[in-house]
Amino acid sequence: MFSLRNLPSLAPFVSAYASLTGYVMMIKPFLEMTIPPPLQNYMISYLNSFLHSTPSTLTLIIDDHIKNGMYNELYGAAQVYISTKVNHNAERLRISRDRSEKNVNIHFSVGEVVSDIYQGIEVKWRFCVDSNKSNMVHYFGEHFKLNPDRECVELSFEKKHTELVLNSYIPYVESKAKVINNERKILKMYSYCCMYLKWQSVNLEHPSTFDTMAMNEELKRSVMGDLDRFIRRKDFYKRVGKPWKRGYLLYGPPGTGKTSLVAAIANYLKFDIYDLQLASVREDADLRRLLLGTTNSSILLVEDIDCAVDLHTRLQPKTQDDTKGSSMLTLSGLLTCIDGLWSSCGDERIVIFTTTHKERLDPALLRPGRMDMHIHMGHCCFDVFKTLASNYLGLSHDDPHHLYPEIERLIKGEVLTPAQVAEELMKNEDPDVALEGLVKVLKRKRLELEKYDGETGRGGLRKPELQFFL
């Protein structure tokens, strides 16, 4: 049986406790008589708050966009990182699946809290959407009342850990998000939404790669080499004091693969594409705001720049209609955004312009530093044809078809574009039938060209062109 005799060392403590209890019982009536009840309650409340106080908490709010419409890359990193921490036992979860994916993606919903432990401290993430924010926007002479949803992520933790969270945990989240993105990279294609004045995205699922790209092999190797050199020269650009960006001009007839080359570059570098439709941009200020909303490691694409919008150039005097408006989109504003001080607001950027008529472009747009590499996307040559035959008919380069010599003779010059050749190869899955049909088309097209050249006096063959400005 347990008794104090079994624990003689506790006897002094028991004796002291009994004495203390006796003293408290003796002075309690005295305290109740001398201290007013309100003061007693205050003292008891203060002691309870002191003994049972909870640590102060700090909450950091990470918005999806920051001032001037610039995308908050920390928000994107937080979203990616949190997606790996979602508790599947939560009460509410959001799910989605892209067309290119088999598995369902799980995201935490509004108000749901996700906990994380970092170096022994606990932090809590919470996703919020504010739908009450409204404002008036003046656009193209019209007033729009918008109610955009402002998305944000809240990060809460004990205030005493602020320095650790800001200097260590946040960089850790960003680095982990970058690794996750590289592992499951899903490229995005962004377009400008006039109604909400912001970029909206869809998944970029274009299958074009440099392996399947129907393009002159020498030209292809030159483009890939230039891209590789650009990516690894971050320190070089910083040392010489230039923004880390590169400009490419793709020019040539329709159907020569300009859009496919853009997709191949995006897939090669794992860069998102921002498709800028200049016709939807009202003035230079809107263009600056749009460019600030793009992210690093991305491609800014302006297709058919010669006919996308009637840019006012420095060689054209302003008309009376031009002076009526207080502002407009100008070539000068475009040049400032892609090559002026605004171009330094970001790293690892690629700007690509496409055009069918290079001669129509202002020379100021084509100079080195703006369009550093001019790539002529010409008609189909024999090397390009062999790539197309491999893609569409499964023919090997090492085992040429018996019609190859005749096709090589007929296809020289500006006869058919790669798109026209691909269309002929798609008409039949039998290689013999498809190539015989292509030979007939090539013969007919050459007769038409020879007749045209005889009437106009045009002669000579154009070779693939590539201009570098390093």
Swiss-Prot record:
Q: Binding positions for ATP? A: G252, P253, P254, G255, T256, G257, K258, T259
- Homology family: Belongs to the AAA ATPase family. BCS1 subfamily.
User: What are the protein's UniProt keywords?
Assistant: ATP-binding, Hydrolase, Magnesium, Nucleotide-binding, Signal
| Gene Ontology biological process | response to stress
Q: What is this protein called?
A: AAA-ATPase At5g17730
Annotated organism of origin: Arabidopsis thaliana
> May I ask which residue range the UniProt record assigns to the signal sequence?
1-18
Known PANTHER family for this protein?
A: BCS1 AAA-TYPE ATPASE
Reported cofactor(s): Mg(2+)
Any idea which GO molecular function terms this record carries?
A: ATP binding; ATP hydrolysis activity
Determine the domain of life of the protein's source. Answer: Eukaryota
Catalytic reaction equation(s) = ATP + H2O = ADP + phosphate + H(+)
Checking SMART domains in the record gives: AAA (SM00382)
